[in-house]
């Protein structure tokens, strides 16, 4: 849940930061769309990888990648070196990580519960993702408004660290 929360906050923050940096709706569009092509291109491959390798390891590698991205963006913001190009490139890489994490995340549910509990587990996972998708951008928007983009990326990184710790258990 914390990883999905971090992703949702990041999507909001990345778009708002793109606007703040450029004042261009085209730039915001490029930042937002950058996530989609790798998701489309690599998700099928991510499913194959998920079938052949340990899903927990795939998820953790993706989480480490996202932590690296959010840390890089936070440092770039605090050092005033952030550019719109960073956001576009990072959006692409985040989409790539998620193209591998999502199939592994879906597959791992079946590994964690008995077959007779699978429908409930999938439903609970979907409900958790929906709730997180609703609440996280509100939290992220408030943090961005009151504390700025740098602290928002610190929050995102914190969410991702919680996720990798949770996945390690």
Whereabouts are the PLM-identified features?
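Alpha-helical transmembrane-bundle signature of multi-pass membrane transport and export proteins
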Residues: 1-169
């Amino acid at each position: 849940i914390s990883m999905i929360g971090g992703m949702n906050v990041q999507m909001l923050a990345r778009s708002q930061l793109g606007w703040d940096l450029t004042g261009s709706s085209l730039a915001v569009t490029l930042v937002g769309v950058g996530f989609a092509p790798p998701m489309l291109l690599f998700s099928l491959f991510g499913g194959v990888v998920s079938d052949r390798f340990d899903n927990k390891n795939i998820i953790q590698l993706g989480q480490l990648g996202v932590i690296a991205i959010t840390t890089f963006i936070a440092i770039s913001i605090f050092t005033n070196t952030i550019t719109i190009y960073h956001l576009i490139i990072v959006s692409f890489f985040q989409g790539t990580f998620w193209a591998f994490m999502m199939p592994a995340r879906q597959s791992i549910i079946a590994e964690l519960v008995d077959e007779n509990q699978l429908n409930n587990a999938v439903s609970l996972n979907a409900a958790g993702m929906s709730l997180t998708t609703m609440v996280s951008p509100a939290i992220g928007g408030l943090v961005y408004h009151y504390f700025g983009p740098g602290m928002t990326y610190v929050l995102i990184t914190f969410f991702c660290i919680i996720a990798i710790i949770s996945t390690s258990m």
